[in-house]
Amino acid sequence: AEWGRIPDHIIVGLFNPDRNADLVPANDPRYPGTGNGDAYLQHVNDEVLPLINERYRTSDVRLLFGHSFGGVMVLNQLLTGPGAFDGYIALGASTWVSDRVLFDRLEAVDPDFGGAALYMAVGETDGGATVPDGELFAERLDALEPQGLDWVFEIRPGENHFTNVPEGLHRAIAFLYPFADQQAE
């Protein structure tokens, strides 16, 4: 932001005393307590965002970032309330969780995303079904022929579930703000 390549930002991190419950929208018996994700997003949209806007100097541009189950939360927000944020960053999203509930929501979504952007990436050696289900989610999103959604899905070579985050976040910022990656003159 100092060099004028991206707008000023404030970063808000939200504590999750029960991340499984807060981030996953439907019950998954493998992860006790899951299934409160929709209520958590409602809390973020109805209470947290207005509080941030009241207390801090903000703009109308909002980005949402999440990793792993947090990536599920990001994609769930995109599919169930796409107007709340302008940019979505989902890294290592566990799209397989809760019997692929996000796939069901993807099939039911209105394909007009109103001008949002999505950067989605998994590490090449991300465990379990994260890579194949991430690819399948991207294929199904592409098949929707989404309107008003600038998006990209990447499999990050040599990266795993955790090492994907720092470089993935950098690549997401460069994708969302194309001038962010240029050298200062």
Segments and roles (model prediction):
Residues A1-E185:
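Non-catalytic cap/lid and distal C-terminal segments of serine-dependent acyl enzymes
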